[in-house]
Each structure stands twice: as C-alpha cells, then as structure tokens.
Amino acid sequence: MAKPARLATQGLAVALVVGLLALLVWRVANDNGKGVAQKLDDGEHPTAPAFDLSRLDGRGRIDLASLRGRKPIVLDFWASWCVPCIHESKRLEAARKEYGDRVTFIGVDTKDFSSDAREWQDKHGITYPSVHDGSGSVLSEWGGLPIPRIFFVARSGKVVGELIVEEDLPRYLRQIAAS
C-alpha cells in the first residue's frame, strides 16, 4: 500500500518541478527588459515606447511615436477602479488648463473596461484625451503597476521623469514646457 502513495507523491513533486521550470522559461521569454520606470531609476532617459491605441471617446487613435518632435507630453496611466487616480487626474486637468498650449496631456486607461473608463472621465471632469490599454501591455512597458503612474516626455521623445512626489508635477511641467 505504501508504494502507490509514494509514487503519487513523487509524481506530484515531478509535476511541481516541471511546472516551476515552465513558469521560469515563460518569464525569461516574456521579459522585455527594464521598463521605463526602472531605466529612469537607473539614471537613463529612454525614448518613450511607442503605442497606437484607440481613444476612449471614439475619435480615432493616438499614435505616441507620431507625436515626437511636436510638443512635450504628460502621460497619465489610470483606471476607473483606482481611487488615487482621481486626485492625480484632477491635478493634471488643472495643469492642462495652464500648460495645454505648450504640453500635450494623454491618459492611458489600463486594465479596465472602456465603458467604465468613459463614465469615470465624465464623472470627474477629465477632458484631456485618453486611450484604452485594456490588457495592460503598454503599462507593462512603462513599469507596470501600481497606478497612477505619470511620466513626462520631452519634445525629443525622451522620458525625463516620473511623478513620485507632489512637487514633481510643477517641476517636470516647467522642464518639459521649456524643451
């Protein structure tokens, strides 16, 4: 009787090891290197990863790469389920009123339902355009969760910073508006 139990235990152990190896291989194969946030932490100023996503308001798409060389960009990663996103998006909406002629503001609704996101924008008075990144793949390129994540992109397309503390917003806005 002990032999079948031992075989079952060994089989379970082998299955567990094979599963962990498969997970490790998948992780290595799908690791696209350091995200933008990590590169900034390392002192680098990477070129903003390109994306081409549908606007939440249905007015076409936004292709980030095509905006390079025009105006600097503030990129706001948010979701309707994110409570802190309300505060940051309202701060960005106020900043857009001051800097909107010199800086482009773009929201990226991530890991969310587009219908919830549109309702959220209307409810909170957010008027800058947002795109939909339902799978979170664009967010992953920029560093992943947590959100809100707000990045500042110079006119050249280089990412110059990420909002970490409240004081970063006016500082980075002045910096990119002058670029």
Regions found by a protein language model. Give the residues of each.
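N-terminal targeting signals for export/organelle localization
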Residues: 1-54, 179
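Hydrophobic beta-strand anchors of alpha/beta hydrolase catalytic cores
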Residues: 74-75, 105, 150
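Conserved redox-active cysteine motifs that mediate thiol-disulfide chemistry
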Residues: 77-97
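A short beta-strand-turn-helix
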Residues: 45, 50-73
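Conserved segment of the thioredoxin-like fold in thiol-based oxidoreductases
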Residues: 87, 95-135, 147
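Nucleotide phosphate-binding site architecture
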Residues: 54, 65, 83, 93, ...
